[in-house]
Each structure stands twice: as structure tokens, then as C-alpha cells.
Amino acid sequence: MAVGKNKGLSKGGKKGVKKKVVDPFTRKDWYDVKAPCMFATRQVGKTLVNRTQGTKIASEGLKHRVFEVSLADLQNDNDAERSFRKFRLIAEDVQGRNVLTNFHGMDLTTDKLRSMVKKWQSLIEASADVKTTDGYLLRVFCIGFTNKDQLSQRKTCYAQHTQVRSIRKKMVEIITRDISGSDLKEVVNKLLPDSIAKDIEKASQGIYPLHDVYIRKVKVLKKPRFELSKLLELHGDSGKGGSGEPGEAGSKVDKPEGYEPPVQEAV
């Protein structure tokens, strides 16, 4: 026989009595997730967090959350070229009921990557660590595939090792040139139409023609010190509102001349 105290009897509770079930959602609040001004759709979605209770502050629980959103949703566009690209946004500050986010990375969907890899062609990949003018260290990955010449009768379109090395060098040069001279906002604006990949495809035509050239992934390795003023500037007026609507401000009321406030009977 086991020796020990019966916790149920010591507390005076009856054995088999069910505990009162409390819905956990009654202790939570909804917050609006706001994307930076580079994107057409600013309202990304909503997120849940437990209400402020004791030392646990709700806004602290929201910070550093990462949201992954399709570019088609961010740009409010059904274009197939945008649907397979995902942008990662990280929550950096909370203003009222608005969660202000910043760019945290980019990636292609797995199904798109798998569909591009085929037989009888060479896959060329390159990556570079580049620092932006505002102090962000980014690791950028690029991918491309050799294209078959229309006049060629050959089944394959394999590039020679020297050609692959030349194209890879060209990829790193263009990525470094386009990102090192831009701040994070300009980099995101270049990633939206994928202009860097188009420049690489055009520059590689003299070495070996390519197709399906994309910036495959962007990772944020290091960030500068957080500044609220820069984040608010990135969001425009979306974070200025208090607990009410975004950007909502009070209006000034003109008082008549000689106006005196009424005397209150009780305080």
C-alpha cells in the first residue's frame, strides 16, 4: 500500500468533482498586424496575446513575433509571379492596438523550388553577405538555370565549369552592388519586382543564357540598434493612433468668450 497524503481529501474537496472549465480566449486580446509602407496592403492580419496581468505586459509578449505573408497578399495582387514568394515580418513595437512590423527575410515556396529543378540543365547558385547603408547585414541567396539554345539540336544544355564560376561571380557582384548602396527600404523595393534577378539574367547572357533566375532567399543576420523614430517613419501615420483608430487625432473646440466651466456639486 502506498503511503502518502491524498491531496483531494486534505483540501476538503470531493473526489470526482470536475473543475470549472474557463475559456482561455476570455483572457486574450486581438491586435492588428501592420506591414511597412513599402507594401500596398498595410493591414496584414490579426494576432492574439494574453492581457496585461501583473508583471506580464501584453506588448512585450507581442514583440519579436514573426509573421510569414505571401507577396500576393501584401501587394493585393493575384499575379502568379508574386504568389510563390513569402516575406517574413517581425514585430518590433506596439502602438495602441497596432503591432508595427519590419522586414525580416524573404523566401520562395517549396513547391516552386522543386518545380524548377529539371533534368538536362545546370543549376547555378550563389550567396553573398552584404551590409546595407543603414547597418543591416543580409545574406542573399540567388538561383538560376541554364537555358537551351533555340538553334541547338542537343537535348542537354549543361554549362562548363568555367562558365558556372563566371556566372556565380557575376551574381555576387550584382547582389553586392545593388544592396551595399541601398538602405533596407530600398532593398525591399528592389525585391518586390525582383529587379536584382533580372539584372543577373541580363548580365549572364554573354556567358551562358539563363532562365528562372530568382533571389531565392534573404536572411537578416544582424540589425542596428532599434530606434522607434525610424520604425514610425517606415510606417508613416499607421502607428500614431492611441487605443482608437490608427492615426486618429483629437479636434480643437472653440470656446465662447468669457466661458467658465460649470461648478460641480460633488467631486
UniProtKB/Swiss-Prot annotation:
The keyword RNA-binding does not apply. SMART domains: Ribosomal_S3Ae. InterPro entries: Ribosomal_eS1, Ribosomal_eS1_CS, Ribosomal_eS1_euk. GO terms for biological process: translation. PROSITE patterns: RIBOSOMAL_S3AE. It is found in: Cytoplasm. Keywords: Cytoplasm, Ribonucleoprotein, Ribosomal protein. GO terms for molecular function: structural constituent of ribosome. The keyword DNA-binding does not apply. It comes from the Eukaryota. Coiled coil: none annotated. Residues 234-267 are annotated as: Disordered. GO terms for cellular component: cytosolic small ribosomal subunit. Its main location: cytoplasm. Belongs to the eukaryotic ribosomal protein eS1 family. Component of the small ribosomal subunit. Mature ribosomes consist of a small (40S) and a large (60S) subunit. The 40S subunit contains about 33 different proteins and 1 molecule of RNA (18S). The 60S subunit contains about 49 different proteins and 3 molecules of RNA (28S, 5.8S and 5S). PANTHER family: 40S RIBOSOMAL PROTEIN S3A (PTHR11830). This is Small ribosomal subunit protein eS1. It comes from Biphyllus lunatus.
